[in-house]
Amino acid sequence: MKFASLTLTAAVSTCFVSVQGFSPAASFSARASSALQSTVEAPQERVAPGAGWEPEWEGREGKSPDEFLNSDMSRPDLSGMWECPLTRWDSEGIDVVKAQREAKKMPHCPLELKASPAMNAQGIDYFSKNKKKIRADLLKYGAIWLRGFDLMQDVNGFRDMHEALGLDPCLDPLHSSGLRKFASERDALYEEVNKPSLRGHYIGLHCESTAKRTAAYAAFVCFQRATEGGGRFIVADGAAILAEMDTKVLQKLYDRKIRISVSNLDIPPALPGFIKEGIKGAVDKAVAPKFDMDLEMIYESDGKPGRLQAVETAESPINRHPVTGLPVWFNNAHNHARKLRDRRPCGVPEVGMTEVFYADTMEPLSLEDCAEIKRASEKHITALPMEPGDVLLVDNYRALHGRDVFNGDRFHAVSWFTWDDNEEWRGEERRILEKNGLNKAINSMMDWLPKDFESNQS
């Protein structure tokens, strides 16, 4: 749910234009330990978080865009893919202390699977022959870094790989996202957040999930690394974060639950109440449903007079994995908490800023709780130096992902997958074509942003 905020805001603005497993390669980066300070003080220096592990780059070359995006038109068209499945919630009655003990037993995430010359020589056959083990390892480790494979350096080889593994593509949970256009629609491949206007925006850890819909798996592929540096892909184990977090903070968050606001619309506070309620009702009925999220429109939940926020329903920050039953940290607070976003590189305008609240009082998370989420999360980040052909397979109910800032041009892409072995969990919905027009319209709007757009929301 990384950019529900911008996409919802873009749609709102069209309606109300006149309103305003490998060895650690480096120790935990010092930049991650910068202290959080009070939000009422002067704006803080923006510092990109660090990581617990930072493997070295290898300097592998890839293909040109004309080559890596050249789809094989003789293959079946996958554009009528499955709808993203509904979120599998199983969060009641979790013993937090016991859950932390269980989580500590999990192996390091991600597992690195590095291609040898012999493995590369097999091409697609390697994945066909090793399908069972790779799928089992994905469940065990939460993510697998397929490193140095020649096969996945273009869209056709990438598709060969995930089809050999038996993965079944589905839509992004927020298909109407203005920052999620297709790289190759007929291959069910979305472009990742490569837009020049957002290269200076740090994307925090999150699952590709809303309270309503969650993809079961993902495969992130690098076709072109950032030409002028940066752009590491970050991943962390939800089990490791759960085990790491202070037990009292974790229990507090679990007991109180959280709610996430995904958009701000600032209405002049002096407007009469009936006008403000009319705006609220219009947004609720005409715009929010297009995003296939369960949202409530609430005024001034963050204390700002006149601010209308679109807020998701209450959700538990801990959820049991649908297949293994393992309780894991399953929420997007590291990405969406305002107190964290205000202190790192952020390319989101004020209207698109998110916030995380305690569900029982609708108060923003405290500075202390945000600091603990930051510490526990960033200690377990692996910042991957993904190069052409590299793929990160992700169990979306176990591992969280994000992206560091970068310079120059970069091209990563992603395919999302539904439950291929459980028809009930997958559901019977196919692609909702009505979403596509909104998707394209908002993409066009987002392309208007300057290449180095930077927010000034602090």
What is each residue range found by the language model?
Residues 2-27:
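N-terminal chloroplast transit peptides
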